[in-house]
């Protein structure tokens, strides 16, 4: 059991790792890094990659954390509904309600990222962040 006094540090580690993972997803789409394939420049996938790269980096370093996390959460909600439900699930003929289940439509990552970023948005940057170093008061964007 981790003592309560370490909670701010474990949250900082959580924010940094989640931001880093999202940054990696973005760079896969934008530049083909980390085993990915670069998306065509003027495509929806490259736009998503840009949001993921920028927001992931901002969340990782803790700069403009709340707005970046809010935008990232919204992008993941759109990804789940537009890509996983309407495109993949309906393309497979899953229908309702099976098509809404993330395990059936491949949207588990999108749902987890969506609600993780919503939590980060509500909590803020915390320790080990540029926002914290700049002295932004709690609860302020």
Give, region by region, the residue ranges found by the protein language model:
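Extended, low-polarity transmembrane helix blocks
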Residues: 1-31, 44-50, 54, 61-141
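Transmembrane alpha-helix entry/boundary detector in multi-pass membrane proteins
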Residues: 38-44
């Amino acid at each position: 059991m981790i003592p309560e006094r370490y909670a701010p540090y474990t949250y900082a580690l959580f924010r940094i790792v989640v931001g880093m993972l999202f940054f990696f997803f973005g760079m896969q789409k934008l530049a083909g890094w980390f085993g990915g394939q670069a998306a065509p420049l003027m495509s929806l996938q490259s736009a998503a990659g840009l949001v993921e790269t920028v927001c992931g980096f901002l969340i990782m370093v803790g700069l403009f954390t709340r707005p970046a996390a809010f935008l990232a959460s919204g992008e993941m909600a759109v990804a789940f509904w537009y890509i996983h439900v309407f495109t993949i699930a309906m393309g497979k003929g899953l229908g309702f309600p099976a098509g809404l289940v993330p395990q059936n439509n491949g949207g588990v990552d999108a749902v987890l990222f969506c609600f993780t970023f919503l939590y980060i948005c509500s909590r803020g940057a915390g320790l080990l962040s540029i926002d914290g170093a700049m002295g932004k008061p709690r609860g302020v964007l």
